[in-house]
Amino acid sequence: MRQQISQVPIQPLNRESGPTLAWMVVLAVARAAEQAARENRRIAFTLADDDELRGIRDDDPDAVVAWQPSHGWICLLPADDDRRALIDLYLPVCSATAVHPVTVGHLGESLDGFIATHTGDSQWVTGPENVVHMHRLRALCDAVVVGAGTVAADDPQLTTRLVPGRNPLRVVLDPGRRLRDDHRVFQDDGSDTLYVCARELVEPGERRFGSAEVFGVSGTGDGLDLHELIGALRARGCSRIFVEGGGVTVSTFLQADLLDRLHLAIAPLLIGDGRAAIRLPPPVALGDCHRPAYRVFRMGGDVLFDCDLRSRLDDFPSGDEDRTIARII
């Protein structure tokens, strides 16, 4: 069967352009999810001039998305509409609510499964399109989580500089407190920052680390109790959590079964050896491995797998591929 990958446009264009209009739709559906869920019925929407959703008939040619109580957001645009791929990609994250939250992980890796060289050089494994994609995920999510290694290596700002959208709460995991407070994420005022470490390492009365709030959670020997952390973030109103990296951090969330979706951007690059993308305890047989349902999108020269970790391919009957692979190579 001849198959195609959907191209997700990323260039910042004018307000009337397909990609920009599609992103305005994505932001609007993310804002409207809680209200749509409370209605508990199917409702179709279009994008109004104020960039907010307006209810509309399902069969109206201007209908763009619809809320389905059993599924969340679905896109109503025809398959050949150049806005559809971008909207489709983000709808599972936009469907999150306080009752049904979502945690999504992301890694950009080489063809042979590495996120950096052995020295830690990682800028950039994937192309600029994937960088914009990460900024989009930040804009959609209430919190972005990174490990100490990512902060030490990349000194990221973790803001939404490249796209319209609000900055998320920045969460830095540093179990053993090896970071200094001179990194940008602890010094700028781009957004609130939570500096998370083992509770026993928090000094009595200590509240700030640079400009960040110090937050202690239970230690687990070689890390942090991530279930406790997720519970604390949910209590702060974080329905959408984005685990941006690096490989160790995403792997620990994956091993703890705390990721609902995983975005893997694979670049046409061979590193040979270096820092691995994902490392989990070794399985005995392939039958023990998780083969999730997935969709495939193209971003410039990279290929993005959007994996639904709460579903498996063998959960779906044979011949039902359209439900599991929206963009097929």
Residues covered by each model-derived region:
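Enzymes that bind and transform nitrogen-containing heteroaromatic metabolites
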Residues: 1-329
